[in-house]
Amino acid sequence: MTARHRVKRALILTWLVMLAPLPSQAAKGSACAMTHATIARDEAGIRETMAAYNAALNGGKTAAVLPLYTEDGVFMPPYSQSAIGKSAVAAAYDKVFEELHFDVKFTIAELVVMAPNWAYVRTNSAGTTFHRSLGKKLAEANQELFVFKKGDDGKWRIGRYTFSPTNPPSK
């Protein structure tokens, strides 16, 4: 074996050792633990949470929305400061539901499990909102971004949520 082949072989072995997962990395919570089966289960769990959020939003109950957020969840509506943590998120949704009654449907445009405990979902929603202060129903359409975090109990919850309207402003 020539010196060139020995160097090449040593480099290949070095790369293999560097890329091989350590036993601790193959445990729960590592990228190495992600398989097609676990990703499929995770996607199903995220879709379940999205459906629950859609129902909770249309139901207008903060108590139904809150369990879908992580303890450190952040709600970032347009033209408002971020609501950080469950108590702030609860206060923000109380205000939203005080003014608006939703009849919307979310459509998932993109769902990506990025790591064993993190995923994002890009959605579009459309329907109507009844504005109590105006006494009228208006068309509603938004694009949304959800960042999900899997809890120790295996449930996927909303860690971050923001949206922007896609309808032009009312005149």
Stretch-by-stretch model annotation:
Residues 70-101:
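Short solvent-exposed beta->alpha transition segments
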Residues 91-134:
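Surface-exposed, charged secondary-structure patches
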